[in-house]
Amino acid sequence: MSTYTRPVMLLLSGLLLLTLAIAVLNTLVPLWLAQEHMSTWQVGVVSSSYFTGNLVGTLLTGYVIKRIGFNRSYYLASFIFAAGCAGLGLMIGFWSWLAWRFVAGVGCAMIWVVVESALMCSGTSRNRGRLLAAYMMVYYVGTFLGQLLVSKVSTELMSVLPWVTGLTLAGILPLLFTRVLNQQAENHDSTSITSMLKLRQARLGVNGCIISGIVLGSLYGLMPLYLNHKGVSNASIGFWMAVLVSAGILGQWPIGRLADKFGRLLVLRVQVFVVILGSIAMLSQAAMAPALFILGAAGFTLYPVAMAWACEKVEHHQLVAMNQALLLSYTVGSLLGPSFTAMLMQNFSDNLLFIMIASVSFIYLLMLLRNAGHTPKPVAHV
């Protein structure tokens, strides 16, 4: 049986369009807020509102999928995100945008959970690794193309919202031509997310997803603002964000291979150390291009390696619950990161963005160095 079946290809095609819309908004919303003369802490709170929506969406989607299936859940998630996009144009203000970004966050998280769960149920233990790799490549390619779009098109609010909303709705079209079945829904008793979070042997993976959420949430939410305060134009900000994301794309395959060959614990240690080096390089302002590249290559690949570490510790039928728990952990980190970092930037210096990233990475590195064990043979390849 082919790994990349027709439902899988159509699902990933729709995801690509949705990711383009998500990337454009994640870059431009902080800039639009800054243009409305909102303070740095307000920008951070709006970013955190989006990730709060991610948290709520992650918790709700399992129930939604069980009730209405993958296809309808995907349609519903897309409509919710489209509403969050269009709502930004109804009223410009801190409180209204706080609400609409929350709505967009719910829709975005639902899209992620639906797609990831559909891929998990479509695959087997032999091809889930390839499916997950394809998923992450599509996600990062869509994000990269979204950053390039920002550098090429008008970034005015009312110019962007119509086509971004249309792009979101277009992401529904591929799934109209196929049906994604949940063939494994009744094969095993459901596993709770809480039990996965409490699993002692998977703690390094869970902690890694939290740290990854803090790092990427801060970069996505506050990096455009950091560059804006440095006098970088909106078009150039899109370019530099594309550099950051392209490094993450290029790093996926080689880092995954290295983790398989040398063990995920060793690779995680090296990755976190490189994130610290990249943050220090950004603070030195010596060469932003290579600094952003190594920061993106190491930072954007933390989540899949940490996720693979945790998934090694569970049985085959627990993989979906574990992935939900890891996405929830990532979302919590994404929620905390921009909020606390924005407050530090507001009260002290914009450089606190990279000091914060380096600090939490150092804490995780200490956790990894304390682990003297070895990476066991995987229970399932995810």
Curated annotation (Swiss-Prot):
Cellular component, GO annotation: plasma membrane
Localization per Swiss-Prot or TrEMBL: Cell inner membrane
Domain of life the protein comes from: Bacteria
Periplasmic side: 35-44, 100-101, 152-156, 225-234, 346-347
Cytoplasmic face residues: 1-13, 66-78, 123-130, 178-203, 256-269, 312-324, 369-382
Transcription keyword on record: no
Single Gene Ontology MF annotation: transmembrane transporter activity
TM helices/strands, residue ranges: 14-34, 45-65, 79-99, 102-122, 131-151, 157-177, 204-224, 235-255, 270-290, 291-311, 325-345, 348-368
One Pfam family linked to the record: MFS_1
InterPro entries the UniProt entry points to: MFS, MFS_dom, MFS_trans_sf, MFS_YcaD, MFS_YcaD-like
Membrane topology: Multi-pass membrane protein
Keywords, alphabetical: Cell inner membrane, Cell membrane, Membrane, Transmembrane, Transmembrane helix, Transport
Tagged with keyword Membrane: yes
Protein family according to the UniProt entry: Belongs to the major facilitator superfamily. YcaD (TC 2.A.1.26) family.
Protein name as it appears in the record: Uncharacterized MFS-type transporter YcaD
Organism listed in the record: Escherichia coli O157:H7
Gene name as annotated: ycaD
